[in-house]
Regions:
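Short beta-strand/loop motif that positions the catalytic acidic residue
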Residues: 151-152, 157-159
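Short beta-strand element of the alpha/beta-hydrolase
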Residues: 40-49
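C-terminal catalytic histidine-bearing segment of alpha/beta-hydrolase fold enzymes
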Residues: 180-225
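Short amphipathic alpha-helix adjacent to the substrate-entry channel of hydrolases
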Residues: 55-81
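A conserved short beta-strand
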Residues: 127-140
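Gly/Ser-rich "nucleophile elbow"/oxyanion-hole loop immediately N-terminal to the catalytic nucleophile
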Residues: 81-115, 221-222
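N-terminal cap/lid segment of alpha/beta-hydrolase-fold proteins
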Residues: 1-38
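Short alpha-helix in the alpha/beta-hydrolase fold that links the catalytic acid
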Residues: 166-176
């Protein structure tokens, strides 16, 4: 792992790099970025649009860490059953009291970009310690909503009318089923508006998305000194 003060957003010294996620006799891979200070930091698990953490997802994890929020992005693989197992192992990893850098045992968040919503929704349903969720560029279909609605926890939906994958109109129709979820909709912004390695990337939309996510998780996740 590297140790650095990154230029740009945030002020925390951070540790970041490849991380091993233990699960019994097996070990899975992922990317972890966290503040370098001695403290139990608020923590999120991040699921991106691909099975492995992309450069954009890694960058977002580092940004969270510079703002005092640890972020773990697991490499979930292509097999659906295995992916859910790895997602569960990631939750157990950060909730382990031996992870002295994380306050996840007292509550943590999940963040999904595009297709990562399925795994995030599963954790919301099955892991009571998930206390907040956010999704970016992903349609809230009936399958996801059924799982998210099992829990009355704070949620944040961010989508763009210029991004078909956001499914804005369909997602807005489920607001009644998710009464504690805030909906933020951009009038424009192409597919991948949040991802700096996407042709549809928008600096303006990314900055606003970043600020909304940091503010949301900063408000709802526990921090312990």
């Amino acid at each position: 792992m590297g140790v650095a003060v990154q230029l740009g957003e945030g002020t925390e010294d951070i540790i970041y790099g490849a991380s091993s996620i233990p699960a019994g006799p097996r070990t899975f891979g992922g990317y972890l970025s966290r503040p370098d200070g001695v403290r139990e930091w608020p923590t999120i698990v991040v699921f991106g649009p691909r099975t492995e953490p992309t450069s954009s997802i890694k960058n977002i994890c580092r940004i969270f860490a510079r703002h005092g929020i640890a972020a773990l992005a697991p490499d979930v693989g292509s097999d659906e059953k295995r992916a859910r197992s790895i997602a569960n192992a990631s939750a157990a990893f950060i909730m382990n009291p031996a992870a002295a850098w994380s306050s996840a045992e007292y509550g943590f968040g999940v963040l999904a970009f595009e297709g990562g919503l399925d795994l995030a929704a599963n954790l919301v349903r099955h892991v009571p310690t998930v206390i907040a969720f956010a999704t970016v560029g992903a349609a809230l279909d009936s399958s996801a909503v059924d799982r998210l609605a099992d829990r009355t926890i704070p949620g944040l939906y961010i989508g763009s009318r210029g991004d078909e994958g956001s499914g804005v109109d369909a997602s807005l129709e489920v607001q009644e089923a998710l009464p504690t979820t805030t909906f933020a909709v951009y009038p424009d912004g192409d597919t991948g508006f949040w991802s700096d390695d996407s042709p549809g990337y928008s600096e303006e939309r990314f900055v606003d998305t970043r600020d909304r996510l940091i503010g949301f998780f900063g408000l709802h996740l526990p921090e312990r000194s």
